[in-house]
Amino acid sequence: MASFDYLFHPFVPCTICPDFPLYKSPAFPSSCLHHPRLLFNDKAFCPLFLVPFPASFTRWLTFLFHLVIYNNKMHHHTYAPHIHDLRAALDTTAPQKKCPKETLHRSDHQG
């Protein structure tokens, strides 16, 4: 089975929230895996559902866990400085930063 190491390669700047680190997927070169709700006209959509299952189930679960945590934090317009710093992601007492482009997330906060 093919390796999916590209999911764990170094970060590139996000074009939506420049201060937010993310991974780029070769299958979705213009998509940000940390902004699944912003893909395809702001409809809730996770690109992982269209990617073949990776060789390492544990690494896939770890990546999915990170995605869920950070998607939840983006829903509240906050983010941790590094995707692998789970302590910062889970520490609700730590200072949080606002998303610099929070208006782009307004579709999740209507009503």
Swiss-Prot record:
Which cellular components does GO assign to this protein?
membrane
TM annotation in the entry: 48-70
Membrane topology term reads: Single-pass membrane protein
Q: Which UniProt keywords apply?
A: Membrane, Transmembrane, Transmembrane helix
Primary residence? membrane
Q: Where in the cell is it found?
A: Membrane
Q: What else is known?
A: Partially overlaps ERV2, YPR038W and TIP41.
Protein's UniProt name: Putative uncharacterized protein YPR039W
Q: Which organism is it from?
A: Saccharomyces cerevisiae (strain ATCC 204508 / S288c)
Q: What are the leading ranks of the lineage?
A: Eukaryota, Fungi, Dikarya, Ascomycota, Saccharomycotina
